[in-house]
A protein has these predicted regions:
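Metal-dependent phosphoesterase signature
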Residues: 1-37, 47
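Asp-based, Mg2+/Mn2+-dependent phosphohydrolase catalytic module
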Residues: 19, 40-43, 56-57, 61-161
Length: 161
């Protein structure tokens, strides 16, 4: 929205956007190449998987149910009265719903907001360079950066027998 827009105009436009996205969230949305196979490999190793998103809760759950049925154990999107990332609230909720401790969690993301979220939650983090932001934006967080799903899987599973 342009600077100086009246708050009521901004609110109406945002509400219209949210309705449109909820109705059209599948349009032009696909998993990145290699993601389904990597997730299957993690599930085969017994990993519990969760999604934490700043997208609205309903579309996030619809996307995950459509593209990854039965893969994720917890899916949390943006909801009223829950602070959005980089606040750690949704991460804590997800980790708790999985019956895990934050020290067992690995947060994977593709943006500076994700790096901040992991730091705020106090959990390990791996960032990926193929998503929302490029490598340069991710470097300041000091966590591993994966350039492919194969590299991400290797980072996640190193040390496993």
């Amino acid at each position: 929205m342009p600077d100086g827009c009246a708050p009521d105009v901004t609110d109406r436009v945002f509400a219209a956007f949210k309705r449109h996205y909820a109705e059209n969230c599948m349009v032009l949305t696909r998993p990145y190449p290699g993601i389904p196979e990597m997730l299957d490999a993690l599930k085969a190793r017994g990993w519990q998987l969760g999604v934490v998103s700043n997208k609205a809760d309903e579309p996030v759950k619809a996307l995950i149910a459509h593209y990854f049925p039965g893969v994720f154990d917890s899916v949390v999107g943006e909801r009223e009265n829950v602070r959005k990332k980089p606040a750690p609230d949704s991460v804590f909720e997800t980790v708790g719903s999985l019956g895990c401790d934050i020290g067992q969690a690995v947060y994977i993301g593709d943006s500076d907001v994700d790096g901040q979220t992991a730091a705020n939650a106090g959990c390990d983090c791996i960032l990926v360079a193929w998503g929302f932001r490029g490598r340069e934006t991710l470097l300041p967080f000091g966590c591993p950066i994966a350039d492919s799903t194969d590299e991400l899987l290797n980072i996640l599973t190193e040390g496993e027998k």
